[in-house]
């Protein structure tokens, strides 16, 4: 008989075998802070225009080469529970603003690093949390005073492109002016009078070959497909969209046909042909000259489409079908019935084109008032185009933020240094032990210009002391000059290096909330992970759509 070994008394006695339990400052708080610091240190070197790229290979063995913090974190699949909180804060920033995810990580990491110093010299966790919350509230009071300008006209391409440059610069340094112009053209062309801008209305089509400066904007949609039939170009297109295969009706039951004479054999397929002819003729009779289908195209149906001079395009993706319906104003029909006028879409031209060596079908609106705009990106490698696409997403999201709030604050560390200066002064006036936490909160803002300086290869301490001396003289808009070879500063407003007010507001709020949440944890209780076989890797799931 096996000997029963009693469990050690205490918390472990209540839990199943294999459960872990950590408590207290040393085991829980400092461990959590260490994990968050490591995470912030990872993405800190990727901050700003001179940030380094990370090469991430995810569990599906897909390669990512990027300095976009949101992508890095999404593919890393962080497991540590405290670090996950910081990751969730950065995801919230991405959902709310679409940019500034790395700011949240770097700032939250700095807050926790400085909180550890305070805890080690004897402050209690509650005093640190209280000080951080007071300082965060003060930062939000000061932030509106730091607004240096506002966007005047969001329908002016030149003005919009100058405002988008900063967000694109951090991802594609050197190409930001060209990309900002492309994104501005795409956004302005579909910006509705109501002011409700939808980021999903800007599509990206990536075509391998050439270089980034061969990219272009098109009002309408571009698909990497070839037309099915002989017709390759249609002007003033009337489009019928079908979500079903372009084929004759097939009965669900299997049948056996008994043929007695040669004449019956001759007439057997003729009836099917006549039926298909009548169906395609009826569709052509409504005025439709382009058919888009979401399924297979039968050879006989293709023959009659060519006979009635109808252009035929096949889209496997149901998402592409939906977007096309939105672009041309069509309704997707579930059966091969002739569409009524209200169900047909309209487009100025549909044509087959060749970009590089890739065949594309273009649905184009001549007037700049279409529902969807497409940016056609060119690049030498897939990884490069993926990274450019992420820069485009940031630019489009920045435009969306500007439609909500047109205020802008100076970039390049200028806003952070001014906040640090003013919050430090405020901390001096506060009684009680919270003042130490308030001053450390102000010091945490230095992490942003410090990261920019270190990534640019200049001495961070020299730059920060220069910034403080200039800001003490009242120059609120002066930030780090990342293009200078020596530590230098310049006016961010004159250089058009501007950040959105909303982006900064939410980043400070979310980073502080995440840091405070991590500090509030004094016990970690982890159950034993569930066993069981792992799902097979590399194989598709049984219910995934199979593309024909």
Curated annotation (Swiss-Prot):
Q: What is its EC number?
A: 3.6.1.-
Q: Where does ADP bind?
A: 47-48, 100-103, 169-171, 412, 499
Q: Which PROSITE patterns match?
A: TCP1_1, TCP1_2, TCP1_3
Q: Which residues carry this modification: N6-acetyllysine?
A: 318, 400, 466
Q: Which Pfam families match?
A: Cpn60_TCP1
Q: According to the UniProt entry, which residues carry Phosphoserine?
A: 23, 162, 269, 317, 537
Main subcellular location of this protein, as a coarse class = cytoplasm
Does S-adenosyl-L-methionine appear among the keywords?
A: no
* Known catalytic reactions: ATP + H2O = ADP + phosphate + H(+)
Q: Name one GO cellular component term.
A: cilium
- Name the residues that bind Mg(2+): 99
Provide the residue positions that the database annotates as binding ATP: 100-102, 170-171, 412, 499, 504
Q: Crosslink site(s) for Glycyl lysine isopeptide (Lys-Gly) (interchain with G-Cter in SUMO1)?
A: 459
**Functional description taken from the UniProt entry:** Component of the chaperonin-containing T-complex (TRiC), a molecular chaperone complex that assists the folding of actin, tubulin and other proteins upon ATP hydrolysis. The TRiC complex mediates the folding of WRAP53/TCAB1, thereby regulating telomere maintenance. As part of the TRiC complex may play a role in the assembly of BBSome, a complex involved in ciliogenesis regulating transports vesicles to the cilia.
For this chain, the family text in UniProt reads:
Belongs to the TCP-1 chaperonin family.
Can you say what this protein is called? T-complex protein 1 subunit theta
Organism whose genome encodes this protein: Mus musculus (Mouse)
């Amino acid at each position: 008989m096996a000997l029963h070994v009693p469990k050690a008394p205490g918390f472990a006695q209540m839990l199943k075998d294999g459960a872990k339990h950590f408590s207290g400052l040393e085991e829980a708080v400092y461990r959590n802070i260490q994990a968050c610091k490591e995470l912030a240190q990872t993405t800190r070197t990727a901050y700003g225009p001179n940030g380094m790229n990370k090469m991430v290979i995810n569990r599906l063995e897909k390669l990512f080469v990027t300095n976009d913090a949101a992508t890095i974190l999404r593919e890393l699949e962080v497991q540590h529970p405290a670090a996950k909180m910081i990751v969730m804060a950065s995801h919230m920033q991405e959902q709310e603003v679409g940019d500034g995810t790395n700011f949240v990580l770097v700032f939250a990491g700095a807050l926790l690093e400085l909180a550890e110093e305070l805890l080690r010299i004897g402050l209690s966790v509650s005093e640190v949390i209280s000080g951080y919350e007071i300082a965060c509230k003060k930062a939000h009071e000061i932030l509106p005073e730091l607004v240096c300008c506002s966007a005047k006209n969001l329908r002016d391409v030149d003005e919009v492109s100058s405002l988008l440059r900063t967000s694109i610069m951090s991802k594609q340094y050197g190409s930001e002016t060209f990309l900002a112009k492309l994104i501005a053209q795409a956004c302005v062309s579909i910006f509705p009078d109501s002011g409700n801008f939808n980021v999903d209305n800007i599509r990206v089509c990536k075509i391998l070959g050439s270089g980034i400066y061969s990219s272009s904007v098109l009002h309408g949609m571009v698909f990497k497909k070839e037309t099915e039939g002989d017709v390759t170009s249609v002007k003033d297109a009337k489009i019928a969209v079908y979500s079903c295969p372009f084929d004759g009706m097939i009965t669900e039951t299997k049948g056996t046909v008994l043929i007695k004479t040669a004449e019956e054999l001759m007439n057997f397929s003729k009836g099917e042909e006549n039926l298909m002819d009548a169906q395609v003729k009826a569709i052509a009779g409504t005025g439709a000259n382009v058919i888009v289908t979401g399924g297979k195209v039968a050879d006989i149906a293709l023959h009659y489409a060519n006979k009635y001079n109808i252009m035929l395009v096949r889209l496997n993706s149901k998402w592409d079908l939906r977007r096309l319906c939105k672009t041309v104003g069509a309704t997707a029909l579930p059966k091969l019935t002739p569409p009524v006028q209200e169900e047909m879409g309209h487009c100025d031209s549909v044509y087959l084109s060749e970009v590089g060596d890739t065949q594309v079908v273009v649905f184009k609106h001549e007037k700049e008032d279409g529902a969807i705009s497409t940016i056609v990106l060119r690049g030498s490698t897939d990884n490069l185009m993926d990274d450019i696409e992420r820069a485009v997403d940031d630019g489009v999201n920045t435009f969306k933020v500007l439609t909500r709030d047109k205020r802008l604050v100076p970039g390049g560390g200028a806003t952070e240094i001014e906040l640090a200066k003013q919050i430090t002064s405020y901390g001096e006036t506060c009684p009680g032990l919270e003042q130490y936490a308030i001053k450390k909160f102000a010091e945490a803002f230095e992490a942003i210009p410090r990261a920019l300086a270190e990534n640019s290869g200049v001495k961070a301490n020299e730059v920060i002391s220069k910034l403080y001396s200039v800001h003490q003289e009242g120059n609120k808009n002066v930030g780090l000059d990342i293009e200078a070879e020596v530590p230098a500063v310049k006016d961010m407003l004159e250089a058009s290096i501007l950040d959105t007010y909303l982006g900064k507001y939410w980043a400070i709020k979310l980073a502080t909330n995440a840091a405070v949440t991590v500090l509030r944890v004094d016990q970690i209780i982890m159950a034993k992970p569930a066993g069981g076989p792992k799902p097979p890797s590399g194989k598709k799931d049984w219910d995934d759509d199979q593309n024909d």
